[in-house]
From Swiss-Prot:
The keyword rRNA processing does not apply. GO terms for biological process: arginine catabolic process to glutamate; arginine catabolic process to succinate. The active site is at 243, 277. Its EC number is 1.2.1.71. Keywords: Arginine metabolism, NAD, Oxidoreductase. The gene is astD. This is N-succinylglutamate 5-semialdehyde dehydrogenase.
Amino acid sequence: MTLWINGDWVTGQGALRVKCNPVSGELLWQGNDADAAQVGQACRAARAAFPRWARLSFGDRQVRVERFAGLLESNKVELTAIIARETGKPRWEAATEVTAMINKIAISIKAYHVRTGEQRSEMPDGAASLRHRPHGVLAVFGPYNFPGHLPNGHIVPALLAGNTVIFKPSELTPWSGEAVMRLWQQAGLPSGVLNLVQGGRETGQALSALEDLDGLLFTGSANTGYQLHRQLSGQPEKILALEMGGNNPLIIDDVADIDAAVHLTIQSAFVTAGQRCTCARRLLLKSGAQGDAFLARLVAVSQRLTPGNWDDEPQPFIGGLISEQAAHQVVTAWQELEAMGGRTQLAPRLLRAGTSLLTPGIVEMTGVAGVPDEEVFGPLLRVWRYDTFDEAIRMANNTRFGLSCGLVSSRRDKFEQLLLEARAGIVNWNKPLTGAASTAPFGGVGASGNHRPSAWYAADYCAWPMASLESDSLTLPTTLNPGLDFSEEVER
């Protein structure tokens, strides 16, 4: 029984689904998808639970959410292993994900009060108040690259605000989704407040098509995000938060310490086997000897990166991709770039047949026309050369996406120019593109999102503002508007 609906574990009535470790092939999880009827049951359960949950004091909701944080802490080792085994990422990285989940609780509580708390302004004849109210029933679609942390970034603020939730994990990480749901169960959430439905495209379509849904919070690919946007078009009453991918540029300007800049580039492009939405996909290098030296050093260090299994010792920097199919898609993308005229500096290689262990790839595309503006979700970095910094900024902005952008430079004036001209939601200076703070908003523009950033701003899309003018008593104004006469009626 792998679905959690209205406080009970039930068996899915849809297709059978299995999940294996993408490196070893070990069977990890199996269960059945939720069918459309069960998705409807989950929605009805969430709707029935909403009034009571929303009427609880914030403190009462906070207690349950903080109890979940405690359970994450006490089950950190077990959850780390589940996430690592299912995604293929190394143990060390899965541990940082669980830590981020724990830290998200306190951050979300603070964000609720700062972004969506209550305010009161005294007026001569009363007061003006601002409060925030939950939307109702929200669907959360989780991704596979951070199957615990990223859904958590929607679910926690949604519950704190008083919403009830239907959570659909990625079909590639059902085990992690179930493991997190079991901790929420132990935290003592009332029945129906949080429901879990497993499944792929059919389950997702049934969930997003529900008429009685008040909103949908999504993290994933631009293609799926656009499909959801079209499906919910013409329904302005539903909140839709889309956190999508990017074709992110990293500009290398002047480099005093080449190894430090190479380290930053590797952290930007190849961490999580290139499976972060903020990963650098395009490296913009100065033409000339300095750019040549940097690229040579980047290739030399990158070719030493050997992917390994989640529990290998010593721990590898990167593990496998989410699936063998995903690894083959990256190789195919590299081959297509070569066919267009790209010059391979480092060829991506599948280490073993039947696994997702893929080494990083680097290919120079300077002077190649018609390169697709797409996100290749894996360890593949494309390189372009530029002559002037203005040209570098134009190249950085030459994308339909707008998630992250970075600059390596000793000159603050260039960073300030980039801040003014870059079209991206995250713009970093001498920091990896993959570095983000939960105390700041996280999201992009263009094809990277719909102006509903998450992290610190997640509270914004989990509640709507209610403004009030208030007075303890009602009296006739001493000064009336022209044309109003409240004198005693004169006998005719």
